[in-house]
């Protein structure tokens, strides 16, 4: 019997789009995010399509994660799919100029939050005899760009953590997928530039980025494949994005 789908960072972006996609398919949902007002509205809306349960949660707080997951009521507590979506980027300054608090926040959210949610929920998924863990990574894990520094490092962790989860869970009937999107027009850049709408919007000037719905389609697809198929890693970019050529500094530029 299909269990519930738990999505972190469900109040916007990939998380919200994924919630809508799974709700349309009638899957029971556990939606977690820091912004309670948004989660409450989303749960009220999607409950018309599928059973929904909302959690106000900051994944950086280990104790809060453990308490929240332990108190998920039936039938939602039978989590089959864990979508670790909560994450963010802050700033584009070089490593010699960046605010160290930005790095702390990215590490606490993108790495520690991922670990807390996975370690807390995984025993249940093992006990139920199977399921799927989907981790949201980024092309920044593989392709460096100026200002990515700690953000790219955290997403490289997500990539390698996902691979090692696969190794740990061999024989447990649990699939693990790392989905790595490129440029996508969500609230990502708005958060990165601390609410500067002009700066955030300019990131996508003159090109068609991915949309949150595009990534949600991918997440839904990998979780809907026959149970014997595991998509280990899936990197996706808009057509008009590719990896950059090697950067070369010329003496004349000094």
PLM regions with names:
Residues 118, 154:
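Active-site helix of classical SDR
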Residues 11-12:
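Conserved glycine-rich cofactor-binding loop
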Residues 37, 57-67, 100:
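The beta1-alpha1 cofactor-binding region of Rossmann-like NAD(H)/NADP(H)-dependent oxidoreductases
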Residues 138:
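Residue(s) in the substrate-gating loop at a strand-loop-helix junction
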Residues 178-182, 197-245:
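C-terminal helical subdomain
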Residues 93-95, 99-107:
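Substrate-binding pocket helix/loop in short-chain dehydrogenase/reductase
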Residues 27-42:
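Conserved glycine-rich Rossmann-like NAD(P)H-binding loop of the short-chain dehydrogenase/reductase
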């Amino acid at each position: 019997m299909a269990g519930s789908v738990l999505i972190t960072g469900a109040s916007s972006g990939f998380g919200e789009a994924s919630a809508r996609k799974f709700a349309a398919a009638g899957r029971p949902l556990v939606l977690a995010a820091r912004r309670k007002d948004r989660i409450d509205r989303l749960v009220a809306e999607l409950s018309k399509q599928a059973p929904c349960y909302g959690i106000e949660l900051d994944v950086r707080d280990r104790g809060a994660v453990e308490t929240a997951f332990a108190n998920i009521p039936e039938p939602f507590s039978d989590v089959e799919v864990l979508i670790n979506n909560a994450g963010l980027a802050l700033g584009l300054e070089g490593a010699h100029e960046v605010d160290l608090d930005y790095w702390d926040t990215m590490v606490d959210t993108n790495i520690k939050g991922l670990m807390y949610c996975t370690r807390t929920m995984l025993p249940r998924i093992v006990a139920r005899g199977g399921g799927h863990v989907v981790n949201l990574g980024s092309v920044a894990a593989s392709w460096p760009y100026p200002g990515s520094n700690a953000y790219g490092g955290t997403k490289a962790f997500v990539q390698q953590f996902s691979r090692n989860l696969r190794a740990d869970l061999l024989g447990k009937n649990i699939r693990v997928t790392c989905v790595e999107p490129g440029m996508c027009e969500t609230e990502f850049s708005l958060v990165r530039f601390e609410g500067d709408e002009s700066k955030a919007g300019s990131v996508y000037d003159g090109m068609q980025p991915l949309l949150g719905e595009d990534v949600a389609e991918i997440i839904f697809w990998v979780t809907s494949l026959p149970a014997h198929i595991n998509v280990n890693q899936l990197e996706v970019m808009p057509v008009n994005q590719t990896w950059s050529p090697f950067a070369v500094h010329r003496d004349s530029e000094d």
